[in-house]
Amino acid sequence: QKTTRLIKEKFTKVEIQTTFQSRFGPQEWLTPYTDKTLESLPKKGIKNLLVICPGFASDCVETLEEINIQGKESFLKSGGVNFDLIPCLNDNSDHIELFEKLVNRYI
């Protein structure tokens, strides 16, 4: 939620929302759910979507399959027009340098 707040401070002219991914089983999970939100946005007039997953350092099944394939399909089938996913940091040199600095603190 802090990440969302900081991003909102930088990008004041666009709507930014946090949703929660990876619920499993029948137990209640943090809300709003990503999948339900992606379905509902086109009905609220939001047809273009840019998604970022700052909770993930590297792309994985959740970002590649659940968000970029299943989520995109759900958004578009519900009336969305454009869906783009910003890749995670993955093997970006800045990301690797950050890990190096963090590890070097402890060795």
Regions found by a protein language model. Give the residues of each.
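Extended amphipathic ligand-handling, pore-lining, and cofactor/metal-binding catalytic surfaces
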Residues: 1-107
